[in-house]
Amino acid sequence: MSGSMEGNAVSFKGGVFSPYLTTRLPAWAGVRQNVMGSNVDGRPVAPANSATLTYATVGSSVDTAAAAAASAAASTARGMAADFGLYNQLAASRSLREEDALSVVLTRMEELSQQLQDLFAKVALLNPPANAS
């Protein structure tokens, strides 16, 4: 889309061929939402806020590949969101690793506490209290 400013009016030359840009506007802006559109070749274009998340492109094969990748990613994300078992398994293994690390830290702290008590006992033997005569 290109535009030029002439006085107080804006003149647009070209067009926007993406339903994504228009469907992001609020309904009160006069934009039709969830309405099947078409591209410049007349092929149907689903709106960006539809459940299919498929886009027809008017550009190069790179645009087609990008649209296919975006659609596949959205489909995968929906599938992962529906599969709670995957998330539970990942969360369980992470919590087990965290518990193992915490157990190692607690064991080391107990060892250090014991060493500190031994050191206090040795210092007490070397430096008896002054009032114990």
Curated annotation (Swiss-Prot):
Localisation per UniProt entry: Virion; Host nucleus
Gene Ontology molecular function terms on file: hexon binding
Residue runs in coiled coils: 97-127
Any one biological process term the GO annotation gives: symbiont entry into host cell
Induction record: Expressed in the intermediate phase of the viral replicative cycle.
Keyword tags: Capsid decoration protein, Capsid protein, Coiled coil, Host nucleus, Host-virus interaction, Virion, Virus entry into host cell
Main localisation: virion
One protein family per Pfam: Adeno_PIX
Record-level GO cellular component terms: host cell nucleus; viral capsid, decoration
Protein family (similarity comment): Belongs to the adenoviridae hexon-interlacing protein family.
Domain commentary: Three N-terminal domains of hexon-interlacing protein form triskelions between hexon capsomers.
Subunit structure, interactors included: Homotrimer. Interacts with hexon protein; this interaction tethers the hexons together. Self-interacts with adjacent proteins. Interacts with kinesin light chain KLC1; this interaction leads to capsid disruption at the nuclear pore complex during virus entry into host cell.
Function: Structural component of the virion that acts as a cement protein on the capsid exterior and forms triskelion structures consisting of three molecules that stabilize three hexon trimers at the center of each icosahedral facet and fixes the peripentonal hexons. Dispensable for assembly. During virus entry, recruits the anterograde motor kinesin-1 to the capsid docked at the nuclear pore complex thereby subjecting the docked capsid to a pulling force.
Extra facts: This protein is only encoded by mastadenoviruses, and may therefore play a role in mammals tropism.
Name this polypeptide is given: Hexon-interlacing protein
